[in-house]
A protein has these predicted regions:
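Acidic-and-aromatic substrate-binding clefts and catalytic sites of carbohydrate-active enzymes
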Residues: 29-34, 77, 105-114, 139-140
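Active-site region of glycoside hydrolase catalytic domains
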Residues: 1-68, 84-104, 126-127
């Protein structure tokens, strides 16, 4: 988009380390599938140092929809196929990818969230894609409760989720 191109041009023209630093560029709405659609094109970058940034709460009915399903047994792992598509579209062509927002809202289903985070980050790590959990501080049961870390109390609410994600990236 013009906005993405203006961003790259402005940062590159600012001088200093800005001429070669990596820049993250979102697709339309930062949507993972939109990033792979022919309507999305990366801006031109003389430094050739762009990273595609997407958000991916998938599958939606598990990850975000309060009224969706709360069990994760791996049977819907096909809903994570966008990771393979991001890899073949970008990673395999020398462009980095960051899933800058992902997570599964708390539905009082910790064990299922751990299994989901394991499947999700194992697949992403194997593809060379970094994931950033959307930690909005919410720990109640229901929509938009993605909290993992108590920043004030300096403790981890759900170490099992964090541990499985770190394990998957440390094994790569």
């Amino acid at each position: 988009s013009k906005l993405d191109q203006d961003f790259v041009d402005t940062v590159r023209a600012a001088g200093g380390f800005n001429e070669t630093r990596y820049l993250m560029v979102p697709s339309n709405r930062a949507d993972a599938w939109t990033a792979m659609h022919k309507s999305f094109t990366l801006p031109t970058d003389p430094a050739n140092r762009l990273i595609v940034s997407v958000h991916a709460y998938s599958p939606y009915d598990f990850a975000m929809n309060e009224n969706g399903y709360k069990e994760w047994d791996g049977s819907k792992i096909g809903d994570l196929s966008f990771i393979d598509s991001l890899k073949s579209t970008y990673i395999d062509n020398g462009v980095g990818v960051v899933i800058g927002e992902f997570g599964a809202t708390n539905k009082d289903n910790l064990e299922d969230r751990v299994r989901w985070a394991d499947d999700y980050t194992k697949k992403a790590a194997a593809a060379g894609i970094c994931c950033v959990w959307w930690d909005n501080g919410g720990t109640k049961v229901g929509t938009e409760n993605f909290g993992l870390v108590d920043r004030i109390g300096k403790k981890i609410y759900y170490p099992e989720i964090l541990d499985t994600m770190l394990k998957n990236y440390n094994e790569q």
